[in-house]
Amino acid sequence: MTDQKLKSAPLAYENDQFLNSPDGRILRLLSEYSEPLSRFRREQIQDTVVFFGSARIHSHNDANSRLTEVRGNAAQVSPTQQSEDMKRAEAAVDMARYYEDARRLARLLTEWSSQIPAKRHRFVVTTGGGPGIMEAANLGAHEAGGKTIGLNINLPFEQFPNPYITPSLNFEFHYFFMRKFWFAYLAKALVIFPGGFGTLDEFFEILTLAQTEKLAKKIVIVMYGSAYWKKIINFEALVDAGMISASDLNLFKMSDSPEESFEFLKQGLTKYHLGPQQPKRNGDAAVPEIAKTRP
């Protein structure tokens, strides 16, 4: 026998070694569902308008400052490097208009939605929580005095929370698919600004859900910046090749101004999510209150 006392084992829900192991994965997944759900309920969030777009698009001020800096460094770098730096800096200045447009559109939407009589917050501007277009949309909503959501993702580069997210609605996800779930689940509208791989991934996933009618709601979709998107994606070629139906092009609208986009979104959101009560669809009874079209 020994007089040495055995230490108590850690409680399972406080055992970091277990929680961060493969065996604890299901609990981590449930946490990224249950914790956001709890906060959305507490913050009285009914539904959202999601903005997707590049983290690499800067404001006019930042882009012009960078261009001035590049011009000032001309004597310190090789001609080849200077040419490349100028090309990127000038492109950033050109793309900066999308930052300002996202900011303007988010402000218009928030000013309108804040006037909707409802028990919960309607059509809350939501982004991926990072810089670029995400920052611009959160900024516009913040300037309008509304709540605004950031669904951030833990990455080794590029992603950090912008300062315009409502602090109590700032989220950090480990799993991409859980983050995507919350984008899709609460969204009643989607605005896609110019972006790269991440934006395309997010857009096409929700577009596919809408096209296959896997969403138990009508989602209003705007592709912002027709010149950019028509250069990046040839939707007409997909129709001509028989890969999609011509009617699939009605799933979204191309737009080039904040005011035009706002009117389209307002009309669609009013028609599908603020109008007279429509017949329930299969699965409506299982939808938590925060995600329903009407309280």
What is the meaning of each model-derived region?
Residues D3-L151:
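Glycine-rich beta-alpha loop segments
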Residues R41-Q44, I116-R120, H142, N162-Y164, ...:
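Solvent-exposed alpha-helices and their adjacent loops that cap or buttress functional pockets
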Residues R66-E69, H142-E143, E205-A210, A237-D240, ...:
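Short, solvent-exposed amphipathic alpha-helical segments in soluble enzyme
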Residues H121-V124, K217-I221, L249-F252:
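Residue-level recognition of the N-termini of beta-strands and the immediately preceding loop/turn
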Residues T126-F193, F197, F204:
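Phosphate/pyrophosphate-binding betaalpha-module
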Residues G145-E158, F193, L207-K231, S247:
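Short, acidic/small-residue loops that bind anionic groups at enzyme active sites
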Residues M223-P295:
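C-terminal functional extensions of proteins
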